[in-house]
């Protein structure tokens, strides 16, 4: 059992965490939209990483909101935080690296604050001492470009495997050494970038494991048009990858994708979809009323778990309310899991 700031080495295998949490674990929800709700201005290529500079206390608040809603895994505000991105803003390499470290430290501090709060009782919050993992979020090269290419996966012929490895190497290293338990390689838009991440892990750039999560806009392939099965096969072959799945994708596509993924992986499957709202890249805003409400989002949860999902949460436009609703749904599922696993021991 992990307490306080103890590193979660016991969960080098994601399977151990899942055993502790009754077969299903909850990932947090959207960070950027919550930060905006708390008053942050994210109109910037750095997006939520801007708050590392301007309002770290808001990031801490949002992490804590998710833990109190029942999340078992919280992700750092580093999705769009890159050394190159900070340098473009005029920051030194040292300052850029310290901001990456800070993103993980804030999440670790929120976990400690949460553990302290677990001594109190509050009916409205889930205050339960449990293993909580801090995931260091790594967005794609396209997320750094902030030109929408993370949603197309088309980087052009000039971007090679080596370009991508060089781009991510130091960032992954710094995040891995900052106290995180796992690296979340998120919204991976193509096979080439998955290969780059896998090779960095194989080369020992990070001492901690990672998860690979892809995005899809058609429910069949990843956004670049690469086959989801081929992308998952890259993750499957990498020993340091401890879970695979889908994020930043409309809920209606998830079940079909998971059924495909389950055919080619033995690793735990994770999903954290968007609310389903459409993003308008021209206007840089979400189109209201194009998504599903919390009830509808949660109504999908059973189907996803039946299809083989073990870790679930939300991505863009999902909130602590979404996560609390998932937690409620999982409580009954977890009790079934524990009764069936105890009966299977006789």
Swiss-Prot record:
Q: Quote one Gene Ontology molecular function term.
A: selenocysteine methyltransferase activity
Q: Which GO terms describe its biological process?
A: methionine biosynthetic process; methylation; response to selenium ion; S-methylmethionine cycle
Hey, what tissues is this thing expressed in?
Expressed in roots, young leaves and florets, but not detected in plants not exposed to selenium.
The UniProt catalytic activity note for this protein reads: S-methyl-L-methionine + L-selenocysteine = Se-methyl-L-selenocysteine + L-methionine + H(+)
Q: Which domain of life is it from?
A: Eukaryota
UniProt xrefs under SUPFAM superfamilies: Homocysteine S-methyltransferase (SSF82282)
> Which residues make up the binding site for Zn(2+)?
248, 315-316
Q: Name the species this protein comes from.
A: Brassica oleracea var. italica
What does the record say about activity regulation? Inhibited by L-methionine.
* Protein name per its UniProtKB record: Selenocysteine Se-methyltransferase
Q: Which NCBIfam families match?
A: PRK09485.1
Alphabetical UniProt keywords? Metal-binding, Methyltransferase, Transferase, Zinc
Query: Its induction, per UniProt?
Result: Up-regulated by selenate, but not by selenite. Down-regulated by sulfate.
Q: Which cofactor does it need?
A: Zn(2+)
pH dependence, per the record?
A: Optimum pH is 7.0.
């Amino acid at each position: 059992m992990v307490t306080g700031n103890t590193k979660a080495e016991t969960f080098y295998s994601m399977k151990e965490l899942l055993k502790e949490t009754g077969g299903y674990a909850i990932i947090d929800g959207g960070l950027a939209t919550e930060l905006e709700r708390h008053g942050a201005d994210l109109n910037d290529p750095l997006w939520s990483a801007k708050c590392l500079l301007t309002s770290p206390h808001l990031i801490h608040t949002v992490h804590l909101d998710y833990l109190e809603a029942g999340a078992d895994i919280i992700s750092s505000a580093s999705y769009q935080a890159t050394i190159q991105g900070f340098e473009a803003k005029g920051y030194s390499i040292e300052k850029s690296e310290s901001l990456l470290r800070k993103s993980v430290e804030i999440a670790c501090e929120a976990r400690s604050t949460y553990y302290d709060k677990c001594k109190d009782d509050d009916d409205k919050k889930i205050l339960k001492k449990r293993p909580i993992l801090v995931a260091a979020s790594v967005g794609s090269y396209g997320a750094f470009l902030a030109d929408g290419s993370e949603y197309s996966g088309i980087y052009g012929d000039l971007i090679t495997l080596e370009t991508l490895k060089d781009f991510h190497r130091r960032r992954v290293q710094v995040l891995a050494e900052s106290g995180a338990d796992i690296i979340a390689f998120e919204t991976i838009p193509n096979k080439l970038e998955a290969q780059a991440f896998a090779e960095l892990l194989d080369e020992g750039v990070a001492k901690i494991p990672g998860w690979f999560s892809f995005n899809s806009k058609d429910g069949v392939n990843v956004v670049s048009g690469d086959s989801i099965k081929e992308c998952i096969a890259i993750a499957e072959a990498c020993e340091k990858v401890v879970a695979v799945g889908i994020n930043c994708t409309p809920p209606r596509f998830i079940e079909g994708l998971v059924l495909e993924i389950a055919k080619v992986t033995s690793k735990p499957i994770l999903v954290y979809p968007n609310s389903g709202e459409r993003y308008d890249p021209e206007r840089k805003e979400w189109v209201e009323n194009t998504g599903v409400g919390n009830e509808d989002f949660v109504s999908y949860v059973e189907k996803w778990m039946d299809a083989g999902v073990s870790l679930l949460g939300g991505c863009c436009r999902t909130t602590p309310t979404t996560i609390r609703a998932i937690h409620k749904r999982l409580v009954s599922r977890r009790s079934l899991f524990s009764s069936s696993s105890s009966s299977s021991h006789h």
